[in-house]
Amino acid sequence: MEKIEEQFANLHIVKCSLGTKEPTYLLGIDTSKTVQAGKENLVAVLCSNGSIRIYDKERLNVLREFSGYPGLLNGVRFANSCDSVYSACTDGTVKCWDARVAREKPVQLFKGYPSNIFISFDINCNDHIICAGTEKVDDDALLVFWDARMNSQNLSTTKDSLGAYSETHSDDVTQVRFHPSNPNMVVSGSSDGLVNVFDINIDNEEDALVTTCNSISSVSCIGWSGKGYKQIYCMTHDEGFYWWDLNHLDTDEPVTRLNIQDVREVVNMKEDALDYLIGGLYHEKTDTLHVIGGTNKGRIHLMNCSMSGLTHVTSLQGGHAATVRSFCWNVQDDSLLTGGEDAQLLLWKPGAIEKTFTKKESMKIASSVHQRVRVHSNDSYKRRKKQ
């Protein structure tokens, strides 16, 4: 079996999205899980103007656009069993659209509590439950839950929540991620540095909390990995990386597999630079965890993850001209979608003929929007380098 590092090194750009009337940072990418003959494969992209664009994957042309106006959308996720696309909104709702229909209004609206500002969310693997995380308001930072299923007895498009967890985070809930195959397991990350694992099949919040891990810094990304997805990894806004093994919760073995306060200081990039982390990539077939990072000039780095540390394996270049914000790896055809601050969505495929195009420079975006996108912290890194 070809290793993912070989697949990654063999990627070439086959398509670049066309320019849009309003260039934006591309902050999140997800692809439709339903593939049908005769139907185009859909890609949903979260944009820094608070909207979601739907693209045809092969041509990368914009098919339609959904807005959360007057709120801003945070996160983007396709359902697992249909072409519904979801996003959390700062107006206190989670919205759901039919990605194949150009309709402004959501087909479903999941309402939170009056003061909720949702900044993270996910839907579980059987499409039954949605969980969204809020900004801290007063002393509350919540995880709010809904039943996502359509009810033939109640055709209302608006749904109230099932309830909320309120005791386990003390600051903004920046990340929510359900287990890939267990619909009852969910992990949340927060600006308070805590990463909490819950079994939502258990009635009350205190008993549902399986374990708490501490990254000691604001959480920017979390995910599941390992055989049976019994490990979790975490990245922080100051480029830290943490990896925990839940198999060891009831043993004498340490739960922490890896603890790196600042990846930029420890990974040997040889002649290159590593400016930030983008996300993690667990390859189920090879049981390997990889970390994706990049440079401010658009180069993308693949790093192998083991208990001895992170190792730079290979890099992609010649695509983006600025910070890369998002990626989506397709296991079926080993293709990669990337997006970033140059407003370009790129499709990479293995062994393809390289497409040439003119690079776009990074854009300046409004400060109000900039507050809602991930800002990589260089301050602590620069301070330590001076010491």
UniProtKB/Swiss-Prot annotation:
Disulfide bonds: none
WD repeats: 21-65, 68-107, 112-156, 168-208, 214-254, 319-358
Protein's gene: WDR89
Database matches in InterPro entries: WD40/YVTN_repeat-like_dom_sf (IPR015943), WD40_repeat_dom_sf (IPR036322), WD40_rpt (IPR001680), WDR89 (IPR039328)
Name recorded for this polypeptide: WD repeat-containing protein 89
GO biological process, one term: ventricular system development
Annotated organism of origin: Homo sapiens (Human)
Statement: the UniProt record of this protein carries the keyword Repeat: yes
SUPFAM superfamilies reported for this sequence: WD40 repeat-like
Alphabetic keyword roster: Repeat, WD repeat
Domain of life the protein comes from: Eukaryota
